[in-house]
Amino acid sequence: MRRHENLFGFLALAALWGASYPAIRAAKAGVDPVLMAALRFDAIGVVVLAYALARGQSVVPGRADVRAVLVGGVGIVAVHNGLLFVGQARVTGAIGSVVLATVPIWSVGFAAAFLDSARPTPSRVAGVCLGLVGTVVLAVPGPMAVDAPDPVGVGLLFTSAAAFALAAVGLRRESPDLGVAARQGWMMLVGGPLLHVASLLAGEPQSVSVTPRVAIAFGYLVFAAGAVGYLLYFGLLDRLGPVEINLVSYVAPVFATFVGWYWLGEVVSTNTVVGFLVICVGFVLVKREALRAAIAG
């Protein structure tokens, strides 16, 4: 029974997070991307902390939690999501989800550089290189391309994936006392105000034009992909571990592509499919030993 629950939760998380990429594009019609990210994490932070309180968890950060909250709030919430929302506003949901699927690959590269326990191996190096190749395939249009992706958007998403991976590796060096939900809530409430500052510095209008589509998309980003998605992620992380959870990145593009096609009329190019397959091969090379252990277990 638990195995089926985990499978359902995994697919639900992939669907929720995959659909968030076209939702970002839909919401940009009413609010600029950095302000959108700021408002989203203001709301999610409050919801997640309320969840932690309702579960009887401590939400008061101690000295051991401060650095972890800052690393996550600045690196993951502010930098990663700021770049993600700006980049995603320039490309299709399918392309955005595929570029973000490189996060586990870059995590291994940064771990090899900054963590003593993570030694580079030929297969890991090859996997990281394939991740780069897959991203280039996405960004460079083929000879038959009609509607080439915006290379600036792909570049921003690529940098967003790298920022997430670097911050995640930094968090592995920390030993916080707070539970995952409370810690994530504080990260969001640190990153949200930073995104507001970035929005002001970028000269974005501090206003929201609400239409039915914008309201649905933003509500989805906050409550479905945000609150429900993160809580699903917390539970699955405890039960499945980081290796299997990383596979969500490789299922999410399926849902991102379908929702983008159905809701926004987005077209999937051959480059997107080829780039995704190359990135998948890179992931298998990087995570070969961990995947073998997970299957054997």
Residue ranges of each PLM-predicted region?
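Transmembrane alpha-helical segments that form core, pore/gating elements
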Residues: 48, 107-109, 115, 128-131, ...
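Specific transmembrane alpha-helical segments of multi-pass solute transporters/efflux pumps
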Residues: 15-16, 20-21, 47-100, 106, ...
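Hydrophobic transmembrane alpha-helices of multi-pass small-molecule transport proteins
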Residues: 70, 102, 110, 120-142, ...
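Specific alpha-helical transmembrane segments that line the substrate/conduction pathway
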Residues: 35-45, 76, 84-118, 124, ...
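Helix-helix packing/entry segments at the starts of transmembrane helices
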Residues: 39, 96-102, 169-193, 222-262
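Membrane-interface helix-cap regions at the ends of transmembrane helices
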Residues: 19, 23-26, 30, 44-62, ...
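Glycine-/small-residue-enriched transmembrane alpha-helix faces in small-molecule transporters
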Residues: 1-38, 44, 127, 146-173, ...
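Transmembrane alpha-helices of multi-pass small-molecule transport proteins
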Residues: 30-79, 104-111, 162-167, 184-203, ...
